[in-house]
Amino acid sequence: MKVAVLGAAGGIGQALALLLKTQLPSGSELSLYDIAPVTPGVAVDLSHIPTEVKIKGFAGEDATPALEGANVVLISAGVARKPGMDRSDLFNINAGIVRNLVEQVAKTCPKSLIGIITNPVNTTVAIAAEVLKKAGVYDKNRLFGVTTLDVIRSNTFVAELKGKKPQEIEVPVIGGHSGVTILPLLSQIPGVNFTDGELAALTKRIQNAGTEVVEAKAGGGSATLSMGQAAARLGLSLVRGLQGESDVVECAYVEGDGKYARFFAQPVRLGKNGVEERLNIGELSDFEQKALEGMLDVLRKDIELGEKFINN
């Protein structure tokens, strides 16, 4: 099993690479790519960790050597959000980076499962899909927007509020991966109930958690370590699915039946072809239903922005 991390010298990429080096199954290969010249050194550094995961690093303009034979490709390349930046500022830089890297994936390992971490995910996943389509290799079961960070944040914040163990809480999060498009289904946690006030405050905290980190880091970065953990969790689940493990379920931003929007974060069962099954989002509370209806315009516009970036 070979996993490639593109953007491996960045804050998310290094954290993700460390977690994969320590947690991928024995005999796996990990390849790191970044434009930054330090990348082969990051691989050497990680190679000293005693696990049976072979690691190699590649720098420069061409990601091809890192991508050859990859089963899973995780893309975290791009600029991070700084205080005062909004998503459109990010988009202007990151859209081109994602396009360029996905073009190389389409050429070199078109059958790989692709996880997009680079923000704004609502839009960059649409860009990736259109690039793959143009190359004639798009398979909607093999492209994922990584929204796992919303899930792990929800698990943490619910556990804190209710005095539970975070590892025993699993909150499905649907919609998208920014602001109001992030919708934690707090009504679906067995044995946990919330007041209306708690629901509103908790939902808002989960939606704005990225900004919480950006502000706390005071200009020194965005959420890199928790995002690395979230991306590792999804990446390892993709690997487990490819290896034939049954009942591997994660929430991810995928192209579905278009009921709400072309791309939508929902629980999916993973397997040898990526998404084996898109699972029902279940019954929503009135609060959740209203939030879902209220976000769809924003989500659809985010998606359209990505489609137009490639097709215009």
Swiss-Prot record:
Provide the active-site residues from the annotation.
177
Q: Name one GO cellular component term.
A: cytoplasm
What reaction does this enzyme carry out catalytically?
A: (S)-malate + NAD(+) = oxaloacetate + NADH + H(+)
Q: Does the keyword Metal-binding apply?
A: no
User: Which keywords annotate this record?
Assistant: NAD, Oxidoreductase, Tricarboxylic acid cycle
Q: What class of enzyme is it?
A: oxidoreductase
Superkingdom, taxonomy of origin:
Bacteria
Where do the annotations place substrate binding? 81, 87, 119, 153
Tell me a GO biological process for this protein. malate metabolic process
Cell membrane found in the keyword field: no
* Pfam families assigned: Ldh_1_C, Ldh_1_N
Which positions bind NAD(+)?
A: 7-13, 34, 94, 117-119, 227
Q: What is its EC number?
A: 1.1.1.37
- Gene Ontology MF terms in the entry: L-malate dehydrogenase (NAD+) activity
Q: How does it assemble?
A: Homodimer.
What family classification does the UniProt entry report for this protein? Belongs to the LDH/MDH superfamily. MDH type 1 family.
Q: What does this protein do?
A: Catalyzes the reversible oxidation of malate to oxaloacetate.
Q: What is this protein called?
A: Malate dehydrogenase
Annotated organism of origin: Photorhabdus laumondii subsp. laumondii (strain DSM 15139 / CIP 105565 / TT01) (Photorhabdus luminescens subsp. laumondii)
Q: What is the lineage of its organism?
A: Bacteria, Pseudomonadati, Pseudomonadota, Gammaproteobacteria, Enterobacterales
